[in-house]
């Protein structure tokens, strides 16, 4: 459980929490044959994936929005959110270890016969490792690409795709394989999830319409008058993300509170809303990890729920309280360190 959780935590930061959860679940299906135990692992993967995605600029759609919008920078987010995110994972993991995994879980290693159907043996191990390294680095180095070139981050991802495409085509040109066995990049393009892309496009267009019509300005003025506590606003937004899509919440928040330009005469309250301000940094933590409180609160949770057929009440009874405790503990650690 600890190895799986830490692997998910760090892979989420490199790949993004949804992709990491899908990869880890594929591994779990081979390692944990008993479904009762695997459901517990799967629920813990959701918490670890969202925690890991919160401290990376490419770890979740919401952190990508904040990073691309220049609300937070990559190094600032990593340095400020890593420890709270780690606490967010460790607290539920520790409780689950003593409460839900008292007898442990029996893991198994696949025999060569079982592994035979899972991959194409003609591809050399060296080439497989190279494909893995290129794929991971093409995502992990996107923030570095953006800082060095000052180009949009998506160009860094496309550059990694081009390199991977070139390498795989070069590799297959040297292998004597039937064309149907060659897993080329061009074969994957028709499988792009356009529905999800249009979903996020619709959210951003709707938020833009609300911002243009002035509704978001009215809401921010109301919160400034009656709440006037940026950390509390971020905390509540995170809690709401457990039942409302966090992308919509963060996009709306970015429309409500435009980035304030740095100046010497800024009030203490306005300083929360500058680039790398406390409000945006805490929001990056809250909006992602808050989605773990309910299994339907994040794309990761919904995906794992579908993969393993996890019942909503199963997660709510066993892991919602753990996720809430971890969420509050991580928020408390952030406040102690940076508030």
PLM ranges: what are they?
Residues 140-166:
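Flexible hinge motifs at transmembrane-helix junctions and intramembrane kinks/re-entrant loops
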């Amino acid at each position: 459980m600890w190895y799986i959780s830490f692997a998910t935590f760090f892979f989420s930061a490199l790949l993004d929490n949804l992709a990491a959860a899908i990869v880890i679940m594929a591994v779990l299906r081979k390692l944990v044959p008993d479904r009762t135990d695997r459901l517990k692992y799967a629920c813990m993967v959701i918490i670890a994936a969202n925690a890991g995605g919160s401290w990376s600029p490419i770890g979740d759609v919401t952190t990508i929005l904040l990073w691309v919008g220049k609300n937070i920078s990559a190094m600032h987010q990593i340095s400020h959110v890593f420890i709270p995110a780690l606490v967010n994972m460790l607290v539920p993991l520790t409780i689950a270890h003593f409460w839900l995994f008292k007898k442990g879980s029996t893991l198994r290693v696949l025999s060569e016969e079982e592994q035979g159907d899972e991959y194409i043996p003609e591809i050399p191990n060296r080439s497989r490792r190279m494909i893995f390294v290129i794929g991971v680095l093409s995502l992990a180095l996107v923030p570095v690409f953006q800082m060095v070139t000052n180009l949009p981050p998506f160009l860094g991802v496309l550059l990694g795709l081009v390199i991977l495409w070139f390498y795989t085509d070069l590799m297959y040109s040297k292998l004597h394989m039937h064309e149907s066995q060659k897993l080329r990049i061009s074969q994957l393009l028709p499988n792009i999830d356009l529905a999800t892309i249009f979903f996020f496009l619709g959210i951003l267009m709707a938020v833009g319409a609300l911002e243009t019509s002035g509704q978001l300005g009215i809401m921010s003025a109301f919160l400034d008058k009656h709440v006037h506590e940026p950390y509390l606003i971020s905390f509540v937004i995170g809690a709401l993300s457990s039942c409302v899509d966090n992308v919509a919440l963060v996009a709306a928040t970015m429309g409500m509170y435009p980035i304030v330009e740095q100046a010497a005469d800024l009030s203490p309250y306005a300083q929360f809303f500058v680039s790398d301000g406390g409000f945006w940094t805490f929001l990056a933590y809250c909006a992602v990890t808050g989605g773990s409180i309910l299994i339907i609160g994040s794309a990761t949770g919904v995906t794992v729920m579908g993969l393993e057929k996890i019942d909503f009440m199963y997660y709510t009874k066993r892991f919602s309280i753990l996720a809430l405790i971890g969420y509050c503990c991580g928020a408390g650690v952030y406040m102690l360190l940076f508030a």
